[in-house]
């Protein structure tokens, strides 16, 4: 990949008394005057909203972005309805913008909205509301020392200034998502610094809580699907890439091209079925809980394919519960929708760990062809590009006692799969 992905950061704040002379600013600037920004590994689990997810659903844990889905973390907006996103464009006194905000909007929209529309089968709409004027920051871009592993004090100063200058012209109470977009041509802007910033304690502006913002420092044109990846964090989805402790090595060993939360450059960026289940886009008969002992015959519709108008979506995800906080997920991946550039079609198997932190490997794709690779000139991780099983192939998942056999493919493109557990 052309650049290393960035995990989120969390900002902890301590409120202290502080007056402001503009009543509309309320606590936004006042709160930021005492921000202490720290990189954290987890957050306390937010309030739960009951969700009838079924017997094979893993319980949500305190792990940051836990893939447990028996309840929804109400600290995050659930994308099961229309959500509104504001785009705020920030310029700096050390650089006159060479591009119009409208051009930066076009870098990300409607592509990001269409990504989520396809992934959700039309159940979710993300509506951008760009303010098509530059808002001047009070300090030079170089003063903030913007970079990938940003110094917390500098990040705090940037966020403080950005929200302070935006507040007089933006009514934050109208929006569910906030994108702070920096002038890509300013000398101090580093495209590797794009990420979501979470506030351990929400800020209040215009009578609404601001719990997180997306800081966008992308070049023009930007990396593909970058805003879809970052927006996924806003909806409580984890990073699926592997970050080597020494900063070296391959980042894509966990999921390869599969799912935009692993790599925004992946050939198969559609969200995993497990993610769609968590977000409320799959449910009921679309998820099959496989019995713990015995064999089950399933017909899996391709996850990426939109159901015909007025027709049932069919079964999209099969789940084998393997432990209190673990499961095997089985889904069919095709070459339509968000996966139009996929390397390999077939039945994909992956492990899910509900107690594993974002960035720690909460999902691991099972390589059913460990002795081969595919699309070496395009894939972010060729060893997993051919991970799915094809028709006539059988694979027993190591250590899980589960065998998956792809028996056939129907005329409509669905996959007939036999899953045997307890082997």
Annotate each language-model stretch with its function.
Residues 51-220, 228, 246, 405:
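Zn2+-dependent metallopeptidase catalytic core
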Residues 88-93, 181-185, 237-240, 262-266, ...:
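Active-site-proximal beta-strand/loop segments in catalytic clefts of secreted hydrolases
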Residues 82, 254-256, 344:
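Short, solvent-exposed loop/turn segments at the edges of secondary structure
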Residues 94-100, 268-273, 338-340, 358:
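Short, solvent-exposed loop/turn elements at domain surfaces
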């Amino acid at each position: 990949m052309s650049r290393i992905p960035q995990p989120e950061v969390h900002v902890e704040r301590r409120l202290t008394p502080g007056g402001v002379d503009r009543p509309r600013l309320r606590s936004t600037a006042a709160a930021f005057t005492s921000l202490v920004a720290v990189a954290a590994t987890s957050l306390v689990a937010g309030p739960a909203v009951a969700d009838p997810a079924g017997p094979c659903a893993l319980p949500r844990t305190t792990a940051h972005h836990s893939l447990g889905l028996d309840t929804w973390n109400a600290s995050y907006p659930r994308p099961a309805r229309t959500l509104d996103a504001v785009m705020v464009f920030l310029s700096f006194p050390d650089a006159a913008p060479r591009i119009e905000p409208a051009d930066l909007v076009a870098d990300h929209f409607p592509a990001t909205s269409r990504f989520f529309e396809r992934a959700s089968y039309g159940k979710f709409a993300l509506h951008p509301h760009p303010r098509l004027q530059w808002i001047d920051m009070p300090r030079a871009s170089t003063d903030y020392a913007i970079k990938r592993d940003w110094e917390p004090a500098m990040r705090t100063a940037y966020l403080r200034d950005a929200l302070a200058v935006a507040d007089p012209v933006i009514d934050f109470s109208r929006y569910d998502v906030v994108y702070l977009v920096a002038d890509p041509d300013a000398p101090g802007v580093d495209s590797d610094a794009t990420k979501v910033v979470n506030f351990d304690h929400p800020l209040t502006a215009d009578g609404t809580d601001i719990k997180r913002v997306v800081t966008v420092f992308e070049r023009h044109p930007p990396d593909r699907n970058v805003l879809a990846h970052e927006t996924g964090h806003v909806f409580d989805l984890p990073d699926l890439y592997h970050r080597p402790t020494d900063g070296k090595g391959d980042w894509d060993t966990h999921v390869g091209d599969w799912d935009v939360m692993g790599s925004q450059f992946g050939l198969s960026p559609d969200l995993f079925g497990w993610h769609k289940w968590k977000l409320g886009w799959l449910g009921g008969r679309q998820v099959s809980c496989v019995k713990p002992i015995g064999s089950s015959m399933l017909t899996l519709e391709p996850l990426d394919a939109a159901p015909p108008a007025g027709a049932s979506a069919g079964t999209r995800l099969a789940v084998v519960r393997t432990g209190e906080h673990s499961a095997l997920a089985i889904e069919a991946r095709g070459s339509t929708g968000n996966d139009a550039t996929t390397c390999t079609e077939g039945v994909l198997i992956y492990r899910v760990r509900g107690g594993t932190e974002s960035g720690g490997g909460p999902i691991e794709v099972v390589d059913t062809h460990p002795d081969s690779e595919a699309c070496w000139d395009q894939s972010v991780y060729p060893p997993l590009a051919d991970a799915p099983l094809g028709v006539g192939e059988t694979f027993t998942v190591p250590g899980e006692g589960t065998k998956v056999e792809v028996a056939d493919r129907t005329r409509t493109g669905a996959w007939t799969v036999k899953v045997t557990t307890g082997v």
